[in-house]
């Protein structure tokens, strides 16, 4: 079976922000438990970038709007023959619950911003080599605490993001499932189409092609140019089949 590679591209600013947040939250747990300096810096750097993203926009407001929009979309399926009504009703209740938790939660990221260790590390991350033991003795001693103590603190930090994580996961899952993949063909490495008010493009490419897409556009129209990974010797076929979902 041939291996496919999935590419996703946002068609508006809110989706761009959501995908970045999703990526950074996933990165928080990749190297757990934290057992050394490298793992600690990976964790704190992603926390710092998350807080930077939170400060740039109304993440909570946009998510609450999307939770409401998804509920309205699901309500249009109530009573439609052949549709699993219990599943629809369960999803609506889950969206309502996620919205209630999110709206009553403290400011997103505030718990992390107020943590002394996180604040100290954030100040040093932009300095080359700025997290050495003599620059950050606080981090140095933290890394020598019992593993269980560090694990507990990390779990508390990550848990503070749960209201956001749960709402974002639901929203992105529903958006990704909102459109099926369809076979498309590019000509001379180029493809364009109308977005139909989509928020997200999802594209499957065969790994064997060693091509990647450069995508530009917005929700009403987009263009895809396929580029070879090997810029000197790679070739783009005259006709290239791929799978595309406009979600």
Curated annotation (Swiss-Prot):
Tell me what gene encodes this. zapD
Tell me the protein family, please.
Answer: Belongs to the ZapD family.
User: Which keywords accompany this UniProt record?
Assistant: Cell cycle, Cell division, Cytoplasm, Septation
- Quote the SUPFAM superfamilies the UniProt record gives: YacF-like
Q: What does this gene product do?
A: Cell division factor that enhances FtsZ-ring assembly. Directly interacts with FtsZ and promotes bundling of FtsZ protofilaments, with a reduction in FtsZ GTPase activity.
Record's HAMAP family?
A: ZapD
Gene Ontology CC: one annotated term: cytoplasm
Localization per Swiss-Prot or TrEMBL: Cytoplasm
Top-rank taxon, per record: Bacteria
GO BP terms: namely: division septum assembly; FtsZ-dependent cytokinesis
Chief localization class? Answer: cytoplasm
What is the name of this protein?
A: Cell division protein ZapD
Q: Where exactly are the transmembrane stretches of this chain? A: none
Subunit organization:
Interacts with FtsZ.
Signal peptide interval = none
